[in-house]
Swiss-Prot record:
PANTHER family: RIBOSOMAL PROTEIN S7. The lineage of its organism: Bacteria, Pseudomonadati, Pseudomonadota, Gammaproteobacteria, Enterobacterales. One of its GO terms (cellular component) is small ribosomal subunit. Keywords: Ribonucleoprotein, Ribosomal protein, RNA-binding, rRNA-binding, tRNA-binding. This is Small ribosomal subunit protein uS7. It comes from the Bacteria.
Amino acid sequence: MPRRRVIGQRKILPDPKFGSELLAKFVNILMVDGKKSTAEAIVYTALETLAQRSGKDHLEAFEVALDNVRPTVEVKSRRVGGSTYQVPVEVRPVRRNALAMRWIVEAARKRGDKSMALRLANELSDAAENKGTAVKKREDVHRMAEANKAFAHYRW
């Protein structure tokens, strides 16, 4: 890793329908083999379903679901004198969003519904209600951090 300069984050173009950078990032995470239009169609269909179920605005419903999955702490391995400790660290805001979106997409892919749009809509509505696989993943990460709170002084 070169140490000359810090490379800034790439600017992401907002999505064409809602003008949200967060949604554009979500589409990019869902995208497989560079098929962006397919990923966009899936996300927009899922958001439409989610908005009908919740009675909220598309972006607002998506934001609520994402909020319930965002982790605040995680554990990182730290080697100290021959033994490895799981040290709890706070998650940076950009990584919070990335992890939440990744977990939602992973959970949706594992579901057994008919179409990906339906799976995604179901996972997002579960996340909005604080249940589902993605929320369980966040709770597991938080539980792990809580269990290893004793090693917090090894932070770097």
